[in-house]
Amino acid sequence: MAEKFAEKTFTDPQQIRNFCIIAHIDHGKSTLADRILQLSNVVDARDMRDQYLDNMDIERERGITIKAQNVRLPWIPRTGPYAGEQIVMQMIDTPGHVDFTYEVSRALEACEGAILLVDAAQGIEAQTLANLYLAMENDLEIIPVLNKIDLPAADPEKYSLEIANIIGCEPEDVLRVSGKTGEGVEELLDKVAELIPAPTTDYPDDAPARAMIFDSVYDTYRGVVTYIRMIDGKLTPRQKIKMMSTGAVHELLEIGIVSPTPKKCSGLGPGEVGYLITGVKDVRQSKVGDTVTWAHNGAEEALQGYEEPKPMVYSGLFPISQADFPDLRDALEKLQLNDASLTYEPETSVALGFGFRCGFLGLLHMEITRDRLQREFDLDLISTAPSVNYRVVAEDGSEHRVHNPSDWPAGKLREVYEPIVKTTIIVPSDFVGTTMELCQTKRGQMDGMDYLSEDRVELRYTMPLGEIIFDFFDQLKSRTKGYASLNYEEAGEQLADLVKVDILLQGDPVDAFSAIVHRDNAQWYGNKMTKKLKELIPRQQFEVPVQAAIGSKVIARENIRALRKDVLAKCYGGDISRKRKLLEKQKEGKKRMKNIGSVSVPQEAFVAALSTDEG
């Protein structure tokens, strides 16, 4: 079987090509990966399905890739200097979304080259640019490719020029393929064999093993499956291995390659990508970016390490029925096995009961985590409005880090610092005005703008992260008819005039509705929430004031009118004084009720107030 040569390991590094695909959501990355799998015959025609590498339901449904996947493929180029030779390709499929930049950066570390995939009908997007710059920083060989050339709307001439300007190549070097029809894919694979350098190592074959972890997944039966890229030396089954950052020693139970399904093998040599299983049950034991080496006579220094991904956005997750709290805790633990960047801590709220304060990489990450909790674990959740990490200096000079409005210190504050991000927005030139206006209302400062081509503009702004996480992205899309693309990266912090707005029901604050907002927006937030709650909370037997306040100063108020029984119905005709007596009696009753009555906010009101157009 000539075709199965990729299943033998300890391949000569000269025959190996490690590459990944960088592309924006919907630019056809998974479809191209499907075609590549078919052409190299590693997937039987009958097993083939669309988006073969996207295993999670939510990935297939949203058409996005969340976890990096890797596949080892055999290929015999038909053209170029390596024609007729057996080349083993290792393709690592990366996520394209801004929140998962960390996943991308790890996948890039494991490769020598990258295919830059751009939709021939849309051109390059902001997030693809960010990932492209990451790849260039890692000195990867970039192969530019235009996909979807079979579309009637495709304009390959225009976009080849745009890509050529960005990465500094000739427009004719940009390859043209169609993942759907398979046109040009073989030429692309031949180009990969020709242009992407083979992995190199500075050490002899018998040097201590060093392998970098670029992903880890939790398998219910076998524990944690760790994906690694071998840099130096060899790893074989039944060896004792050590994780260099934690110093933990494990026994290698199984080592293998993924060719699209996991296959055991006799070990991995330099430059190869595969997986290992140690029977450990906790993903945090195999940290992404860590170095694996032999426990005995192992390597001295670790590879280029990774920083831990830091959560940027926080939100409280509460089960709708308190009985689900233990299930929510188990579900979060299981999710954390697969997603090391998710952080959580228990939190209690007077209004919502017990729940967790979770930290996410960004908004999409938050949405997907919530979706997965609801879908995979059947939980009904309320999530509070997202917030970010603030640094607060009190009057006495003490510092606090606050990411939950209920921890906001009372009394006077000397200064408050909020995180800021550098954003890159790519928009068609017709929408530059409205986009700039939107960024200014969100307290953005312009850093510069460039024309990528005559009708596409790149705008660079520094903005507070707190303004972006609410509804910035939705507003940006609606103002630009869906054509804008956004990328952001953190850029430190700045002094800001922020206040905490409390929502009071009958004079008592409801912690779930509190928010930290800029003083200029406090009035708007207060008005919006009081109006919304006035509609959502059912009328009581007595009048209920809904107020928004900063400290003790009320800035907005709405009244929920009392329900009144018609006490005069049984009073036919009769004297006015009789009617007045009944009305006075009713009034007294309402007054007494108002003093002792409490307002119960129905669950739906919480959900509606916190979820709709989170502004």
Curated annotation (Swiss-Prot):
Keywords: Cell membrane, GTP-binding, Hydrolase, Membrane, Nucleotide-binding, Protein biosynthesis. GTP binds at residues 26-31, 147-150. Its EC number is 3.6.5.n1. It catalyses: GTP + H2O = GDP + phosphate + H(+). Residues 14-200 form the tr-type G domain. InterPro entries: EF-4, EFG_III/V, EFG_V-like, EFTu-like_2, G_TR_CS, LepA_C_sf, LepA_CTD, LepA_IV. It is found in: Cell membrane. One of its GO terms (molecular function) is ribosome binding. GO terms for cellular component: plasma membrane. GO terms for biological process: positive regulation of translation. HAMAP family: LepA. Required for accurate and efficient protein synthesis under certain stress conditions. May act as a fidelity factor of the translation reaction, by catalyzing a one-codon backward translocation of tRNAs on improperly translocated ribosomes. Back-translocation proceeds from a post-translocation (POST) complex to a pre-translocation (PRE) complex, thus giving elongation factor G a second chance to translocate the tRNAs correctly. Binds to ribosomes in a GTP-dependent manner. Belongs to the TRAFAC class translation factor GTPase superfamily. Classic translation factor GTPase family. LepA subfamily. This is Elongation factor 4. It comes from Corynebacterium diphtheriae (strain ATCC 700971 / NCTC 13129 / Biotype gravis). The gene is lepA.
